[in-house]
Amino acid sequence: MPRTKGGTVTRARRKKIMKLAKGYRGSKHLQFKAASTQVFVSRKYAFRDRKKRKSEFRKLWIARINAAARQNGLSYSKLMHGLKVAGIDMNRKMLADIAYNDEKTFADLADAAKKALN
């Protein structure tokens, strides 16, 4: 029985990796070994950063809320506590969007938080 070398299977597997490595710099888009290593690392980074993105957006929202709160004479923590006491249940994403796009509405929310604290 003749030996099966698997040329088409190997070619397809390598072609798939090389297609994923398109746009990489240097030998990483030309040589299979370098490309497969880089694709592996890139996928590792993509997995890690999909998790990281959530905390980075939360940090951004908190920074925006804090800046807007300080313009209205409150710290971030006092604003959040005041909103909770006032019974205003808004998540940080919504608050950050209001702080960024609609200063008057955010000022009204800050006033409600101040009243609830006093």
Curated annotation (Swiss-Prot):
UniProt-listed CDD domains: Ribosomal_L20
Q: Which InterPro entries match?
A: Ribosomal_bL20, RIBOSOMAL_L20_CS, Ribosomal_protein_bL20_C
The protein's matches in Pfam families, at most eight in alphabetical order, are given as: Ribosomal_L20
* GO cellular component terms, A-Z: ribonucleoprotein complex; ribosome
Keyword list (alphabetical) reads: Ribonucleoprotein, Ribosomal protein, RNA-binding, rRNA-binding
Name a single GO biological process: ribosomal large subunit assembly
Q: Name one GO molecular function term.
A: structural constituent of ribosome
Task: Please state which protein family the record places this protein in.
Answer: Belongs to the bacterial ribosomal protein bL20 family.
Task of the protein: Binds directly to 23S ribosomal RNA and is necessary for the in vitro assembly process of the 50S ribosomal subunit. It is not involved in the protein synthesizing functions of that subunit.
Record-given protein name:
Large ribosomal subunit protein bL20
Q: Which organism is it from?
A: Lactobacillus johnsonii (strain CNCM I-12250 / La1 / NCC 533)
Give the gene that encodes this protein. rplT
